[in-house]
Amino acid sequence: MAKGRKPTTMNRSDRYLGSYTYGDSHGNSVTDELELGEEDIWSPAVIHDDTTENEESYGTWNLRATLGKNGRVGGLSLAFEGSLVAPPSSSPMIVQKIHGGGGEGEEDRRKLASSAPVNVPDWSKIYRVDSVESIHELDDEDDEDEESGMMPPHEYLAKSQARRSRKIGGGGASVFDGVGRTLKGRELRRVRDAIWSQTGFYG
């Protein structure tokens, strides 16, 4: 190519990337060629084969070509099917009713409206939660034990610990007493027990 020779036609990628640079010496034909048209940006799948570029027929989509293999159309495609075949006009668009009265549509609605039976689990059996009556029976037994008279403190503490472990579920209190049998661990345990008994945590 000669130095002064400029390309007369450019492809789209050259126009997008701007690989050609021009000076001020060329005319409107080159600048028109550099401008992007609507067809460069928007490339529809199928355009009607009308050669006239009037606004009514340009860029009209062919709905039949965009159908799937099974040929089904639903939703907005079905609603606007009649309006896309005819050229657009200045009159307002009338949306077609998708489901007509009677026929298969009502049967589908009946099927959707009914619900299957639901199995509701019995959580008291799953989590082994005692009923309200059994909790009251346990409280009555505890009251009978306390009414029996005076008992030594170590027996009272053992019974109260057993009662607490039954209410909680056998795990006992979830407070770490301390590592080993240190004085600090024992003292904190006594403080903890005193605070819990005064605040009513033990019951």
From Swiss-Prot:
Biological processes per GO annotation: leaf senescence
Pfam families for this protein: Senescence_reg (PF04520)
Subcellular location: Cytoplasm
Region span, Disordered: 1-33
Main location: cytoplasm
GO cellular component, one term: cytoplasm
Superkingdom field: Eukaryota
Keywords: Cytoplasm
PANTHER family (UniProt xref): EMB|CAB72159.1 (PTHR46525), SENESCENCE REGULATOR S40 (PTHR46525:SF18)
UniProt record similarity statement: Belongs to the senescence regulator S40 family.
Name of the protein in question: Protein S40-6
Taxonomy of the source species: Eukaryota, Viridiplantae, Streptophyta, Embryophyta, Tracheophyta
